[in-house]
Amino acid sequence: MADKVLKEKRRLFIRSVGTGTVNSLLDELLEKRVLNQEEMEKVRDENATVMDKARALIDAVIRKGPQACQIFIGHICEDDPHLAETLRLSSGPQSGNFLKTQDSQAVVHSSPALQAMPDDLAKLALSGPKVSLKLCSPEVVERIWKEKSAEMYPIMGKSMTRTRLALIICNTEFDNLSRRAGAEVDIASMKVLLEGLGYSVEVKENLTALDMTTELKAFAARPEHRSSDSTFLVFMSHGIREGICGKKFSEKVPDVLEVNTIFQIFNTRNCPNLRDKPKVIIIQACRGENQGVVWLKDSTGTSGNSSSLAPDDFEDDAIKKAHVEKDFIAFCSSTPDTVSWRSPTTGSVFIEKLIENLQEYAWSCDLEEIFRKVRLSFELPDARAQMPTAERVTLTRRFYLFPGH
């Protein structure tokens, strides 16, 4: 029976479901009259975190009986295939064939973000290779930890109360610049990857620079970071050297989110809940006509001043910066002043290669080693040459993702 299945999957559902799916389930259950308005608002408004909302929601549905549970399961399978795969669910009446078999060596995901894509892009993404993330066995985790624990960032396991968060900001539509065709594929693929790595993913689209700043500050203030071990920030937009273009950018309207603003919002002073935890910034910045430019680099003025300091002054300055700005790494789609390439049908080359390498090596390699492998995949230039680069790196330890752990 469906209620028995939900009881068995309750704990995994609470740990795995994202905000978007919780809200979608609430709407569906209200429409199907499984929940009334008061019950829906109680779940939504009286619980602070996504996990609390998920717990209240599934418990309320289980109490409603098998038919309510069947509607609940059917909506998950239709609206969030990734979650359905994670829970090993299938739609249809619940019987002995309800649970699906799953490869123990890899998890094959179908992105919930595909539901929001145009039909033609959704069909294209689904017809291509599925996103397959190699998992890390407990034995491998134990071996790596024994060998390298002194130089590793502490990682919280899924069995702990871990609330990893990630934020994707993608500008596709602009008032004065060309549409970034193919960006929908990047959003879907990156969301699936980060969810597979254990992050609850927020996606924000088509924002001005001010909107981006507001969203970043709100994300930095999230209490879940206190019980997390890391975060990912992904930016995809048109860009110039000075920063990320907002949707109103033009030659006359400097609607740009400066790079330094991102680091300031998430530094130790402004985001203490992420102190001593890896903060990974992924940047795919595009120019018009399916081309892009990477703009992030150290300020030449700062570099010049640093080189002229006396040793004692330099030491003081370094200590201060280590406390305020630490544990960051920004991985950009190309070196400064060179273009990045994006297909209008399959998405950005950089995002595609990054995802492929994380899928293949996150179970055994630390993040900086994976980024090196991404650069290696671009080593032989062709007509669409670009070279990804890591910038403003202040990671002091190795960061292992250990997917599945």
From Swiss-Prot:
Keyword Kinase: no
One GO term (biological process): pyroptotic inflammatory response
Recorded family membership: Belongs to the peptidase C14A family.
Functional note: Thiol protease involved in a variety of inflammatory processes by proteolytically cleaving other proteins, such as the precursors of the inflammatory cytokines interleukin-1 beta (IL1B) and interleukin 18 (IL18) as well as the pyroptosis inducer Gasdermin-D (GSDMD), into active mature peptides.
Propeptide: 1-119, 299-317
EC code(s) of this entry: 3.4.22.36
One cellular component term from this protein's GO annotations in UniProt: IPAF inflammasome complex
Keywords: Apoptosis, Cell membrane, Cytoplasm, Hydrolase, Membrane, Phosphoprotein, Protease, Thiol protease, Ubl conjugation, Zymogen
Residues covered by the CARD domain: 1-91
InterPro entries in alphabetical order: CARD, Caspase-like_dom_sf, Caspase_cys_AS, Caspase_his_AS, DEATH-like_dom_sf, Pept_C14, Pept_C14_caspase, Pept_C14_p10
Name of the featured protein: Caspase-1
Pfam families tied to this protein: CARD (PF00619), Peptidase_C14 (PF00656)
Post-translational modification: The two subunits are derived from the precursor sequence by an autocatalytic mechanism.
Lineage: Eukaryota, Metazoa, Chordata, Craniata, Vertebrata
GO molecular function: cysteine-type endopeptidase activity
Quaternary structure annotation from Swiss-Prot or TrEMBL: Heterotetramer that consists of two anti-parallel arranged heterodimers, each one formed by a 20 kDa (Caspase-1 subunit p20) and a 10 kDa (Caspase-1 subunit p10) subunit. May be a component of the inflammasome, a protein complex which also includes PYCARD, CARD8 and NLRP2 and whose function would be the activation of pro-inflammatory caspases. Component of the AIM2 PANoptosome complex, a multiprotein complex that drives inflammatory cell death (PANoptosis). Both the p10 and p20 subunits interact with MEFV. Interacts with CARD17P/INCA and CARD18.
Species of origin: Equus caballus
Gene3D superfamilies from the UniProt entry: 3.40.50.1460, Death Domain, Fas (1.10.533.10)
Modified residues (Phosphoserine): S303
Top EC class for this record: hydrolase
SMART domains linked to this entry: CARD (SM00114), CASc (SM00115)
Residues of the active site: H238, C286
Compartments reported by the entry: Cytoplasm; Cell membrane
Catalytic activity annotation: Strict requirement for an Asp residue at position P1 and has a preferred cleavage sequence of Tyr-Val-Ala-Asp-|-
